[in-house]
A protein has these predicted regions:
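Beta-propeller blade termini and top-face loops
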Residues: 1-705
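Extracellular/lumenal mature domains of secreted and surface-exposed proteins
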Residues: 705-791
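Domain-level representation of secreted and single-pass membrane ectodomains enriched
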Residues: 723-725, 769, 780, 788-889
């Protein structure tokens, strides 16, 4: 509670970057970006491959069909005359614009120095003129380097007179407003007070210093009056001279020492009215105050229930006021008020009484809306109300009775970690901040684990086995391709992002780093500790295991590096070497053939301390940082099939590469946004390098193919008893990039992973041709598909709803997980058995395995098979069957 997760997110982000001095050096990132822009090899590589956006494109769906969330937004602003044009700002994902009410989105800030956006201002009569204040108001994921201006509707951006010297300051940009009467006046609030321009942003004056102003609004009819709410020295401040001078507003407000943060809202329904929302020092609800005389006098409207907590009735304490605090008032009714914190509450009487409007998981009978509201805003053109929150953007056109997620198309996901399949092309799984773990299976993204998603792995021999995790090392495993996950974690807590890896020759062996290194030899069913307090109770950050000798294992904790050569019986401290920097280790690489060759990557801003190499097993180290920029390196990966030992490095300024014959080159190639790269992985079957970014989603890059193609594939089912028969083909080819399928029935396809429907009985051979730069390969499976009315049917239920009509029923019926998997939670699905010409059906169960009744009950209270006497589930029920309660209807 009380913003714990938000703090841990920030700590995880900032700690490796400032270790060990604890000094934020945001200016270093800016300086290195400028240096890269001027360098000859900036954004260039031969051949000039480009990065491709992988997604998520649309908001990933949970098993219930509900949208999980795509990424955090700070701001929502509107066009002055067109209600269909919307602008949003993402703290790590940039400026986005929609001209069709959120159906489609485009961004134009990918190559700014820093793409974080805290707020946006639009000219009241010339919407081609816009301003953004850079950075992250609420979370600190990005720093602010000042205000940018657009003259072409947000297509391009230029610097203004307000730019922060980030080599010596670390300011947060919070709000930016344009005077609706005189648009040459620009008011900007920051963590260091208020700045004012009277010439359209060419020059700024610092008019209010030393106060962190996080909320700010103009009076709706008199632009000389501006209200501001602060965070720290918390109160409401007011200017009556258009932002030139500021004073604490009126009487009746709480003491500044009693409150943590304030938020302001005004309404055109009554220009004299202004509301102020306060969070207390516990980050819960302190009170809502109202002034009806332009802020001269204030009245407490309510101080309960706790509008900023997690519960459905406001009976809890605390909240996240320091991180999410939002307030808006209807432009047509001064008494309709919305408050946003973790959830959203609504009042119809000016904030005296409250009803829960939305809840972070849909509890209490309220609508579901993603947690953590950062801005609530009414559009005065159509009276729709919008929420910018940790999941994206929501809109209500009925004053909050219902809400719609319109975040599809916002590529703003903040990935922590990534796992790729080596058997199925483009199958990936990734852990994200705020929105859980996402699985991409071909074209679709699904939300498969909640919480904050962390490290992910897909078994390199079986794509149906995959792993995800949430904070502090709660590792989850799926054996059915991500349909369901269950915890396999040992009883310990790890780092916020806990490292774990599969053994590189036996995927049933798993290593997980907590304060001790745990090893499982049975896929996570049981664990043993193989260290002896080497970290002194501190938690591990990185792990790697030798592919050629699994007894050789390395792990790190901050700058400390440990190694075993005997499977954990004894450990040595490699960090005692004076040649290694005292910086957080962010990546460990052991060569797949020669375990004496080891690479390390480091975070921090120290000059030329990014990558170190050892060719003697860690006894000595060579600094190979070369021309790398002095910014944090976050991950490192080796191309294992490249004889030149090509390595790729993910940094706060994109991706760099080098091999044994070259120095470092940046391969952003004017296509990868200027964003933090948090993890890199190579998928050898597709020959792609995948980059998980912290703010712009997942990207891929085609690597040079150095081997001849190898064609191969598998199918989900090959024996059918009825028509039509649909087969899903999974391409497992390597070193290839184009394909031709011959399904044996006169039909072909060039899709990577096609689905084909056979219309006639028979046996069919299937051939796949796989082409690549170094040739073509083919494979044929003779008589692979067998369709005959005499076959025994093997039926797998759909994930939900109605499946196929079965005209023959001698065989096996599996739940959605198949023979070895688990079904979804709350899964209701069915098939219809309808043999041709039959007027009666007898079902004999030869083997039956469904969960038994619990709690001593004599009926099936959880999972069961139910049979209906008719064509659908509205027909009379013939009985429910589970485990010992079986029979033949």
């Amino acid at each position: 509670g009380k913003g714990w997760k938000q703090f841990k997110r920030w700590e995880n982000f900032i700690e490796p970057r400032v270790y060990p001095q604890g000094i934020i050096q945001s200016g270093q990132l800016y300086n290195e970006y400028l240096r890269l822009e001027l360098s000859n090899n900036n954004f260039r590589m031969l051949p000039p491959n480009v990065w491709t956006q992988v997604g998520p494109d649309n908001v990933p769906l949970e098993g219930s069909g509900r949208k999980r969330g795509i990424g955090r937004l700070n701001a929502i602003v509107f066009h002055p005359s067109d209600p269909n044009t919307l602008y949003v700002g993402a703290p790590a994902g940039g400026f986005w614009k929609s001209t069709d009410s959120g159906q489609n989105w485009n961004s134009s800030t990918d190559f700014l120095t820093n793409i974080g956006v805290s707020d946006i201002a639009v000219h009241p009569t010339n919407p081609d003129t816009l301003f953004i204040i850079t950075g992250d108001r609420d979370g600190g994921d990005t720093y602010s380097y000042g205000v940018m201006k657009s003259y072409d509707g947000g297509n391009s951006w230029q610097s203004t007179g307000l730019s922060f010297d980030i080599s010596s300051t670390y300011y947060k940009g919070n709000r930016i407003l344009m005077d609706p009467i005189n648009p040459n006046v620009i008011i900007v609030s920051t963590s260091n007070g208020v700045y004012r321009s009277i010439d359209g942003g060419d020059n700024f004056t610092h008019t209010f210093t030393g106060i962190n102003i996080v909320s700010m609004e103009f009076h709706t009819t008199n632009s000389n009056i501006i209200y501001a709410g602060s965070k720290g020295s918390t109160s409401v401040y007011k200017s009556v001279d258009n932002g030139v001078t500021w004073v604490q507003s009126g009487s009746g407000l709480p003491l500044t020492t009693d409150v943590r943060r304030a938020c302001i809202s005004v309404t055109s329904a009554n220009p004299n009215v202004v509301y102020a929302l306060f969070g207390n020092n516990d980050n819960g609800f302190y009170g809502l105050y109202k002034s009806s005389d332009q802020g001269d006098n204030w009245t407490l409207q309510s101080n309960s229930p706790n509008l900023l907590g997690w519960s459905t009735n406001g009976s809890d304490s605390g909240g996240q006021a320091w991180y999410d605090l939002a307030l808006t008032v209807s432009p047509i009714d001064e008494n309709i008020v919305f408050v946003g914190g973790v959830n959203c509450w609504k009042s119809l009487d000016g904030g005296i009484n409250w009803n829960l409007n939305t809840h972070w998981y849909g509890g209490g009978g309220a609508n579901y809306m993603h947690a953590d509201e950062h801005m609530l805003q009414y559009n005065t053109l159509d009276n729709k109300v919008y929420s910018a929150n940790d999941g994206g953007l929501y809109v209500s056109d009925d004053h909050g009775t219902s809400w719609t997620d319109i975040s599809d198309g916002l590529h703003i996901t903040q990935f922590y970690k990534l796992g790729v399949s080596q058997t199925v092309q483009n199958l990936v799984i990734g852990g994200t901040q705020d929105n859980g773990t996402f699985l991409k299976d071909q074209l679709n993204w699904d939300a498969v684990i909640g919480g904050d998603g962390m490290e992910c792995i897909i078994d390199y021999t079986d794509e149906n086995i995959m792993y995800g995790s949430i904070y502090y090392g709660d590792i989850r495993k799926s054996t059915n391709g991500g349909n369901s996950f269950s915890s396999i974690a040992p009883s310990n807590n790890g780092s916020w992002v806990t490292p774990y890896k599969l053994d590189k020759t036996d995927p049933n062996i798993i290593y997980a780093g907590y304060d001790e290194l745990y090893k499982s030899t049975d896929g996570g069913s049981s664990w043993n500790i193989i260290t002896n307090n080497e970290t002194g109770g501190s938690r591990m950050d990185q792990i790697d295991i030798s592919k050629s000798n699994s007894d050789i294992i390395l792990f790190s904790e901050n700058a400390n590096l440990f190694k075993t050569a005997d499977g954990g019986l004894s450990w040595s401290d490699l960090s005692s070497s004076s040649s290694l920097p005292n910086k957080t280790i962010t990546g460990i690489l052991i060569h797949p053939v020669n375990p004496n060759r080891i690479w390390l990557s480091f975070s921090g801003y120290s000059s030329a301390e990014k990558v170190y190499f050892s060719d003697d097993g860690g006894s000595s180290w060579l600094n190979i940082s070369g021309s790398l920029p002095n910014v944090p390196a976050n991950c490192i990966v080796l191309n294992e099939i490249d004889s030149l030992e090509t390595i790729y490095l993910g940094t706060d300024l994109g991706v760099f590469t080098k091999d044994s014959t070259s120095n470092w080159n940046n391969i952003n190639n004017i296509s990868l946004p200027n964003v933090i790269v948090s993890e890199l992985e190579i998928q050898y079957s597709s020959n792609k390098l995948f980059a998980a970014t912290f703010g712009r989603g997942l990207w891929s890059f085609d690597l040079q193919i150095t081997s001849s193609p190898i064609a191969n594939f598998n199918v989900d089912d090959s024996i059918f008893c009825s028509l039509p028969a649909t087969v899903n083909f999974t391409n497992t080819s390597s070193y290839s990039n184009s394909y031709l399928w011959d399904f044996g029935d006169g039909n072909t396809s060039t899709s990577v992973n096609p689905s084909h429907t056979y219309q006639n009985f028979g046996n069919y051979s299937v051939t796949l041709f796989a082409s690549g730069p170094l040739g073509i390969d083919s494979i044929t499976y003779s008589s692979l598909i067998n369709i005959s009315s005499s076959n025994s049917c093997i039926v797998t239920l759909p994930s939900s709803g109605q499946g196929n009509i079965q005209t023959a029923c001698n065989g096996t019926l599996f739940d959605v997980g198949g023979p070895n998997g688990n079904y979804y939670d709350n899964c209701n699905s069915w098939i219809t058995i309808e043999p041709n010409g039959a007027d009666q059906i007898t079902l004999n169960f030869l083997d039956f395995d469904i969960e038994a009744p619990s709690g001593g009950l004599s009926y099936c209270n959880w999972d069961y098979l139910e049979i209906f006497d008719g064509p659908d589930t509205s027909a009379p029920s013939l009985g429910q069957y589970c485990n010992s309660l079986t029979g033949s209807p």
